[in-house]
Amino acid sequence: MEAETGSDQQLRDVLEIASALSSEADLPRLLDLILAKARALTSADAGSIYLVEKGKNARFGLSESGEADVDKLWFAAAQNSSLEARSLGKDQIDPDAIETNRSQVFDVRFPISAERLVGWAVLERETLNIPDVYHLDPSLPYQFDASVDRQLGYRAVSMMSVPMQADNGDVVGVLQLINRKKDFRFVITPENATDNTLAFDRSDQVLIEALSNVAAVCVQRTQLMASQDQLLDSVIALMAGAIDAKSPYTAGHCERVPQLAMMLAKEAEDQQDGPFQDFAFEDAEAWREFRIGAWLHDCGKVTTPEYVVDKASKLEANFNRIHEIRTRFEVLLRDAQIARLEGRLAGGDPAQLDQDFEAREQELQDQFQFIAAANLGAEFFDQEKITRLQEIAKQTWVRHFDDSLGLAWEESQRRLAHAPATDQLPVVEQLLSDQPWQRKKRSESEALPEGYGFDLDVPEDTFNYGELHNLSVSRGTLTPEERYKINEHVVQTIVMLESLPLPRELMRVPEYAGTHHETLRGDGYPRKLPPEKLSVPSRIMAICDIFEALTASDRPYKKAKSLSVAVDILAGFRDRGHIDSDLFELFLTSDVYRQYAEQFMAEDQIDRVDIEKYLKAT
C-alpha cells in the first residue's frame, strides 16, 4: 500500500472539514469553524469573513433615506492569533488553540466596491492572492486599507481573498486569510511581520478555493434556514397583530402575553431549588417553540365574530337593541297620554286622569331603567330580577307594521318557517319576548371536531337573539351560545395548528397555544385536561393570559384594574384551583409581576402590592 502523500492528507482534511461544516446550523459558530479550519490548513495567523447582504428595502428600491438600497458587505467575523496572544501577554501561540478561537464580530457594513480587495473578489468572482498588501501596484483598481492595521497595532503582509461561491453561482461572501506564517507558534508584531510570513502558494489557493465553495453552500443553507425562521416568526407576529387589531377589546393581548410568558419561564428555568429546579427548555429551539406557541395562543379568534367578542351589552347584536325596546316604552307612554286625553273627552276627572298618567309614566321610567341596567350586565342578575323582568315583559303594545319586511334572506327564512306572514294587522304583542325565529340552529358543519379529545357542552343553537333570553343572562353580557362561540376559539386554535406540517422542533406549539384555558381542577376547556397532563409551559400560559387580561388598559369596555387588584384576583384563581400555586408564588417572589407592570401598565395603575399575604406559610 502506497504511503499517503501531503495532497492526499489535505484532501482528507477538506472532506472532514466539509462534513463538519455541513452539520453546523448556527451561523456564528459556522463562521468560527470556517475561519479556524481555513487558517489551520494554511498556517494563517489571521482571517476574516465578509458576507454579502442584499438590499432589503424592496419598495421602489430605496432605503429609508431615499437613496438606492444597494448590496453591501458585512464584516461578519475575524480571528487573529497574534493579537489574541499579545492581549493575554503570551509570547507563543498554541497551534491546537486555533480550534477554540472565537471570532470577533464587527458591526460594519459598506457598499461593495472594486476599490476594496474583498469588493473586487466579489464583483470579479476571482481570488486575490497578494504576497505583500503594502506593495501593490498603484495602477491596480483595488488597494489595501491600512487603517485597520494602524488601529489594531498589526501588520498584514500576505493576504488571500477568496470569493465564497455557492452552487447556484451566487457569491455569498469572501473568505480572507492573512499572514501565512513560517512557524505558526510565532507571535507577529508590526516590526517582525515581514520576516516571519510567507506568501500563500498555489496549493494553498486551490485548497482554500475548494473549501470556500463548500463553505459558501453551508453559509447559504444556514442563512436560508435563518431567513425561513425569521419569515415564519414575522408571519406569526403579523397574524397575532391582525387578531389584536381586529377588535379594540383585545388590542395588544397577543403581543403582551408572549412577553410576559417568556419573563416567567425564564425565572422558572433559573431556579436552583424548589419545585422548578429541574425545569428547563432543552435548547434555543425549545425556547422558540414556546415563544411561537405563546404568540399563536389566540390564533383561533380569527374565526370568532367581532360583534360577539365586542359585545358590551346584553341586547347588542350588530347594534344595541336597547334602542328598539326604548321605542316600545315610548309607545306605551304615548298610549298613556292618549288614554288621558280620551278620558278627558269622555268627561273624566282631569285631576285623576293626570294623576294616573303621572303614575304610569313613573312606572314606565322605572321599568326601562331596570331593563337598561340589566342590559349592561354589570351586576349579578338573580332569579328575583329575572322574575321582575318577566312581569315587565308581559305588558303589551300594538304593532301596526309588517315585521317580515326588509329582512335578509336567511332571517326571512327563519321568520317564515315559524310564523307565516298571515297575521292581520294591527297585532298585539308582548313588550319583550323570545321568538322561535330568533334562534339560529347549529348546522352539521358547526359540530365539534372529532378526534381531538374535546370535551365541551355544545349549545343546541349557534345563536339565540331572544330578548328575554339575552336580558336574563346572570353574569356579564354573553349568552351560553355566545360564551361557547368565544371559548370555541381554543378549539379552532388547536385544529388550525395541528393541521400544519410542523417540523419536529415545533411539534409542541399546539400544546402551548391550546392549553391556556385548562385548569388544575380538570374542569377547563376545551379538553378538561387533568393536572398531570399540563406541562410547566402550559401552566405559565394560563397565568399570563389571565394577568394580561386583568391589567390591560386598552379595553374600551372596562376600566383597567390596578396592579394590587389584579394580583388579588389572580390569587383567587389560585385559591380556586384554576392556576398553579407554585408558579403564582414565583410570579410574585421573582418580581415578574412588577417588571411587567413597569413595562406595559399605565403609571396610575401601578400601586403597592403586599405579596406576603399571598405566599404559602413555610
Q: Predicted segment positions?
A:
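Signal-transmission linkers at sensory-effector interfaces
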Residues: 1-33, 37-41, 62, 206, ...
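A short, aliphatic-rich beta-strand micro-motif
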Residues: 157-166, 171-176
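Signal-transmission/dimerization alpha-helices at domain junctions
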Residues: 120-127, 174-183, 203-226, 242, ...
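Signal-transducing coupling segments at domain and membrane junctions
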Residues: 114-119, 126-127, 131-160, 184-198, ...
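Helix-loop-beta substructure at the N-terminus of cytosolic sensory domains
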Residues: 15, 24-89, 113-117, 124, ...
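Amphipathic alpha-helical "output/dimerization" segments
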Residues: 1, 13, 170, 186-220, ...
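GAF sensory/regulatory domain recognition
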Residues: 48-113, 136, 295, 320-328, ...
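Divalent-cation-assisted or electrostatically stabilized phosphate/pyrophosphate-binding catalytic cores
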Residues: 195, 199-203, 239, 310-339, ...
